[in-house]
């Protein structure tokens, strides 16, 4: 084993995995440091909302320092992404320090709002009146900023950024779910298992299949018939949209509650229109998921920059003029790919959620299946990241000559 670790080809990947394990150890330790005892927490029956929070690295079963998870950070990234979407050139000219400060300031503001909402939603009223609510908010905000810092460090020195933290949070949430007795026939259970397997195959298809757009490469002078093509994944945004959409939905709910509580202190915490046991709440979440999936995919593809690269290199698409025509052509292709990928993921998540409205006695099992699907999707992305590092490590001695 020691000999294997000393091999130069895989030294970097092992260091990154070890660093990620250290980050996860801190996260697990912090998520077990309770601020409020379990007896002082309100019992909520909206189990999918708790599951949704866990998909952002949070936990509302107990109030701990990492209860908010990465939700405020993901929401701030969404807001900044949508603001910069219309002017990508200005966004690309910003320094990393400018982007960093904007993200952190916005994350801080959103953390305060979500902390206020979580305390009033999940902590007993008696405990809220007894304790110093501002001190509790300060602890939650500090924990969130620490977790964001850990995720940022893992992006630089570890594996797959915030995804390992979310993966551990989902596993922890799945282990806490109680499914001692399943009120369903063997045929229904078998159908659920088959549907989950089919869904996992579809997700694997989404990750592995790519759309290829052939173009004429002026630098390709080889005698072979090898074609050059522009490749995009079916869902360019990947699994990050699942975390971002949940984060946006939680922020929407907490933001509305925060604004209403300013004018009416006795406002009810339960908002039926934004709950997962109502068709309106599920529909709102799925619309957010679909729109964010599309816009994030378009943001990552960046057709405007790609058309400029084609203009500089002299490469072109057959029958398409360089410049504005190329940009319009790429926008047309990008819209098709991004809407298709976003709609496919939304349908995969939406069908089980709507199904819980018709068979509420199987809601826990269906929620468990949804979490399993999200877990596998995130695992595929993490595996893809590890494979990329292994690929670059394999050719490190060759690539070092050119950078």
Swiss-Prot record:
Signal sequence interval, chain numbering: none
Transmembrane segments: 17-37, 63-83, 105-125, 131-151, 157-177, 186-206, 240-260, 276-296, 339-359, 362-382
Predominant cellular place of this UniProt entry's protein: membrane
Keywords, ordered alphabetically: Cell membrane, Membrane, Protein transport, Translocation, Transmembrane, Transmembrane helix, Transport
GO BP: any one term: intracellular protein transmembrane transport
Family designation: Belongs to the SecY/SEC61-alpha family. SecY2 subfamily.
Protein name, per record: Accessory Sec system protein translocase subunit SecY2
Entry function: Part of the accessory SecA2/SecY2 system specifically required for export of possible cell wall proteins. The central subunit of a protein translocation channel.
Topology within the bilayer: Multi-pass membrane protein
Subcellular location: Cell membrane
NCBIfam families cross-referenced by the UniProt entry: acc_sec_Y2, PRK12417.1
Encoding gene per record: secY2
Source taxon at top rank: Bacteria
InterPro entries assigned to the protein according to its UniProt record, in alphabetical order: SecY/SEC61-alpha (IPR002208), SecY2 (IPR014269), SecY_dom_sf (IPR023201)
GO cellular component, one term: plasma membrane
Pfam families: SecY
Statement: the UniProt record of this protein carries the keyword Transmembrane: yes
HAMAP family: SecY2
Protein's organism: Staphylococcus aureus (strain bovine RF122 / ET3-1)
